[in-house]
UniProtKB/Swiss-Prot annotation:
Name of this chain's protein: Kruppel-like factor 1
Organism encoding this protein: Danio rerio
Biased composition (Polar residues): 247-256
Similarity comment: Belongs to the krueppel C2H2-type zinc-finger protein family.
Primary gene name: klf1
Keywords: Activator, Cytoplasm, DNA-binding, Metal-binding, Nucleus, Repeat, Repressor, Transcription, Transcription regulation, Zinc, Zinc-finger
SMART domains for this protein: ZnF_C2H2 (SM00355)
Membrane-traversing stretches: none
GO molecular function terms listed in the Swiss-Prot or TrEMBL record: DNA-binding transcription factor activity; DNA-binding transcription factor activity, RNA polymerase II-specific; RNA polymerase II cis-regulatory region sequence-specific DNA binding; sequence-specific DNA binding; zinc ion binding
Amino acid sequence: MAVTQAVLPSFSNFCTNSENMKFEKGFLDLDSKDLHQSPASYKPSQFLTDEHQDDSEGCWDMEFLLSDWASMSPERSNSQNYTPQRPTLQDQLHSPDLYQELNAPKPNRHQVCVASSLAELLPPEATLSSSLPPDLQFNCGFLDQQAAKSYSQAENPQQFSAFPVTSNVNRDSSMGKMGKSWDFGHYYQPAPLISFPDSKFVQTQGITMETVVFPPHHHYNFIPSYSHPRLYQQQANYVHRPPPQSHFPSTQSMVPDSTVPPAGLESKRIRRGLVKRKATVHSCEYPGCQKTYTKSSHLKAHLRTHTGEKPYHCTWDGCGWKFARSDELTRHFRKHTGQKPYECLLCHRAFSRSDHLALHMKRHV
């Protein structure tokens, strides 16, 4: 208060000298009776006469208020350039002597904004529109909107996660801590949320993508009998399952596998032949005889030699030969008939037995 009294004299000195009061053009008295009239009925002379009627109301010395701010340039009107010796504007505006008349209720709402002339010189944080009554703020549309925007941003500085709103005074300190990362476009993002099928959200702070367990993907079975498999190419992760095995033998087992090379087939055939030969080998069971035959008929004929049985008899008249084998009987019968079916191609000689022709062919060689 001592500093305020040293800077601002009492208002009684301002109001007694009406000659020192200066009014801007277009200033209207708050108690003027002609405000209810139409705008066309006003005259410039009425403004001057109505302004000098009420000398008891509080008034401002505009020259004195503007004298402190006239030496300051608009560039130095920011809040961060205040000098510590000069009293702050907040102490000047909230002094009880200054607002004893402004806080009084006014019957008329049509008032002119006095702070419009000081808005260009005063900093935006200390404009008069933030301290005036609602009636004065109604007329100060543009200044109130600008102040409201700045105050609304200051009330919720954490509204934006990327760039918090700070004042000009704290900008240097805040930029030193967090502003270096903003120059490169890096900022802290809130932890994202992952939704699960049970409509619950889990915050992923401290959880990496490797630890998150996702629900299993659905696999689609391929339809083998479908004639257009291209329609299923857009699906993902096909799983081809073999058909169920039935108890009955299928025809697919009889078809040789196409993936096996031909060499493998030949080896299989050779092995199968060896197995068959080993399985069809017939050996003589007579003691001391080790002969083997691939046919059972041949083995029977061999056993007849051991037993002496001769079941085949010659039917030629006067001949009673008997034979143990049928081929022996046929050769014997050709002697009676004189038939020689085997003939040499080189010398045209005929033979009744095939083995005799084979011996003859060796002579020509």
